[in-house]
Regions:
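A short glycine-rich, His/Asp/Glu-containing loop-to-beta-strand
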Residues: 34-74, 80-81
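Short acidic (Asp/Glu) patches
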Residues: 49-63, 94-106, 121-124
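Short, surface-exposed secondary-structure edge patches
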Residues: 69, 108-111
């Protein structure tokens, strides 16, 4: 998990490449977003606005074809994560949802919140504790070389 303290830092570090530019484009579209409605930019990025507490789960969520970028607008929450290699599969990978559910010990725990940008990489799985409401943009970006079996 990569945590950046602000959007300016994200823009400075990740300024090369179409996928990063599309992340900024998604964030710039914030005034037009309504909670829970998914939007897309091309076929490589989807995004939505979340308002409220992230669902707390006992299992860790992992992806393969997408990685997540969360940009926090308001509030703060606790996220826990661990390398997938240290976790056990509880629910096998589902190609239609790009999710797998894993169990095991928390490797790291961190409070993240307003102004921060968090990138969840594909070799890690994460879960939220649902400890407080947040307002954030959740961006799902295809992994380089990723593909869709059903398209």
């Amino acid at each position: 998990m990569i945590t950046l303290d602000n959007l300016t830092l994200f823009k400075n570090i990740y300024r090369e490449g179409k996928k990063w530019g599309r992340c900024v484009e998604a964030i710039d579209n914030l005034p037009n977003l309504k909670p829970g409605i998914c939007h897309s930019i091309g076929d490589s990025l989807t995004y939505r606005l979340q308002e409220g507490a992230s669902p707390a789960t006992s299992l860790f969520e992992g992806q393969r074809r997408y990685f997540d970028v969360h940009y926090y607008l308001e509030g703060a929450e606790t996220v826990e994560w661990a390398p997938k290699s240290e976790l056990a599969v509880e629910q096998a990978y589902d190609d239609t949802t790009d999710r797998e559910w894993l169990a095991g010990e928390v490797r790291e725990r961190q409070q993240v919140g307003k102004g921060q940008v968090v990138i969840f990489e594909n070799d890690e799985a994460y879960r939220f504790t649902g400890d407080s409401p947040v307002r954030k943009v959740i961006i799902k970006v295809t992994v380089e070389g990723g593909y869709f079996k059903n398209k």
